[in-house]
Amino acid sequence: MRLILLGAPGAGKGTQAKFICERFGIPQISTGDMLRAAVKAGTPLGIEAKKVMDAGGLVSDDIIIGLVKDRLQQSDCKNGYLFDGFPRTIPQAEAMKDAGVPIDYVLEIDVPFDAIIERMSGRRVHVASGRTYHVKYNPPKNEGQDDETGDPLIQRDDDKEETVRKRLSVYENQTRPLVDYYSGWAENGNGAAKVAPPKYRKISGIGNVEDITGRVFGALEA
C-alpha cells in the first residue's frame, strides 16, 4: 500500500494516517523528519540541505525528491508507505512522477472550510496537563476552566481563526490544485509517465473518528 493523503489543515489527516499505517504495516513519510535525519547523519544530500537552511533558504525540490528516493529504499518501506503533507505543490508532484516514485492510491479527506474553522478555532487547551477541550463538541464544565484544576484554558495561536484562515488560504492556492492533478491523472491514464497512475479516492471527513476511519478503509480496500 503506497499512498498520498490529501486534505486541508484540520481535516484529520494525522489521525487517519496513524490508523492506516497500523492497518497496513507501513511507515508515515515526513519530509521534515527526513531532512533532520539526513542533516544529522551527514549524508551528501543532508550536507547540501544544511548549507541551504543555514543560509536561510528553502530546500529545493530536487534535494527533497532525492531524500524521498533514499528513504523509500529502507527496509520498513517494503510493504509500502504513506505521504502526509507531501507533495504540497504541482512541481513536487511532477518531480515525484518523473523520479518514478510509485503510488497506488491518492486519498482525499474532504472537509468544508467552515467546518474546519469551527473545529480548530473552538479548541481550548490546559497547558500544564495537555488536556484539550472544544467550546462546542467537548466543553469544560465551567467555561474557560480546566475540569480537574480550575486553571484557565488557552487558545493556541495556531487555533486562532485568523491563523486558521491564513493556513487554509495557502492550502487553497498551493495544495488544492493537487486534487485536480491526481484525479485527472487517475482518470486519463499514464501518458509518458514512468509509473502507473494511482487510484483516486475521496471521502468525507465529517463525523466521528470511527466513521471516518471506516470510510478510509472502505475506499482503500474497494
Swiss-Prot record:
Catalytic activity of the protein: AMP + ATP = 2 ADP
Region (Disordered): 135-162
Compartments where located: Cytoplasm
Annotated Pfam families: ADK (PF00406), ADK_lid (PF05191)
Residues holding AMP: T31, R36, G57, L58, V59, G85, F86, P87, R88, Q92, R156, R167
Keyword set, alphabetical order: ATP-binding, Cytoplasm, Kinase, Nucleotide biosynthesis, Nucleotide-binding, Transferase
Enzyme Commission number(s) of this protein: 2.7.4.3
Chain segments carrying region LID: 122-159
Pathway named in the protein's UniProt entry: Purine metabolism; AMP biosynthesis via salvage pathway; AMP from ADP: step 1/1
Superkingdom, natural source: Bacteria
Annotated GO biological process: AMP salvage
UniProt GO molecular function: adenylate kinase activity; ATP binding
Residues given in the record as ATP binding sites: G10, A11, G12, K13, G14, T15, R123, T132, Y133, G207
Segments for region (NMP): 30-59
Family statement: Belongs to the adenylate kinase family.
Alphabetical list of PANTHER family matching this protein: NUCLEOTIDE KINASE
Subunit structure: Monomer.
Name of the molecule in the record: Adenylate kinase
Organism per entry: Ralstonia nicotianae (strain ATCC BAA-1114 / GMI1000) (Ralstonia solanacearum)
